[in-house]
């Protein structure tokens, strides 16, 4: 085997390994979210971004003193949400929802949504998150938020 072929093969292995690690990190729940920090909150839908690789739900959550805090929730990819019965217009701006999930490790006002519930009807919409849930909600309850 020539040195040129050996170098090319070694380079290919290094590049593929790097891509694999980057891909794993991007899709790793544990890298971004803390499963020891469950949360449940209710707020008003302000925006839904129906994009790949994840759908994002933005909600204003009431705070003490009448103010609100904007939160962003990562959900599963559009095709998984569609399998669960979601459509682009499943939620409307101004609709009140309750969301269960896990807070981001960096402490920001972002979270991975596990379950979205319409407050008015009690209808549960699975969020198809990357935390290993079933499509219709959850195979097990989210631990109580502290």
Q: Residues of each region from the PLM?
A:
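Bacterial N-terminal signal peptides that target proteins for export
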Residues: 2-11
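Short boundary/loop segments of OB/S1/cold-shock single-stranded nucleic-acid-binding domains
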Residues: 24-39
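Structural detector for short beta-strands of small beta-barrel domains
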Residues: 38-53
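Short aromatic-glycine-enriched beta-strand elements
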Residues: 51-62
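Short nucleic-acid-contacting surface segments enriched for D/E, G, S/T with interspersed K/R
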Residues: 83-99
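OB-fold/S1-family single-stranded nucleic acid-binding modules
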Residues: 104-127
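Extended, charge-rich, solvent-exposed interface segments
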Residues: 122-146
């Amino acid at each position: 085997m020539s040195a040129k072929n050996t170098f090319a093969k070694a380079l290919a292995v290094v590049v593929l390994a790097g891509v694999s690690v980057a891909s794993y990190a991007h899709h790793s729940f544990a890298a971004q979210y803390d499963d020891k920090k469950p949360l449940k909150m209710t707020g008003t839908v302000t925006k839904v971004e129906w994009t790949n690789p994840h759908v994002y739900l933005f909600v204003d959550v009431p705070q003490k003193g009448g103010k609100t805090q904007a939160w962003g929730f990562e959900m599963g990819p559009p095709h998984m949400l569609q399998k669960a019965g979601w459509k682009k217009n499943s939620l409307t701006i101004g609709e009140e929802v309750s969301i269960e999930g896990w807070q981001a490790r960096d402490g920001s006002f972002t979270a991975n949504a596990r379950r979205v519930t319409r407050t008015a009807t009690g209808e549960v919409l699975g969020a198809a998150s990357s935390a290993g849930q079933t499509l219709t909600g959850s195979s097990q309850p989210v631990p109580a938020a502290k």
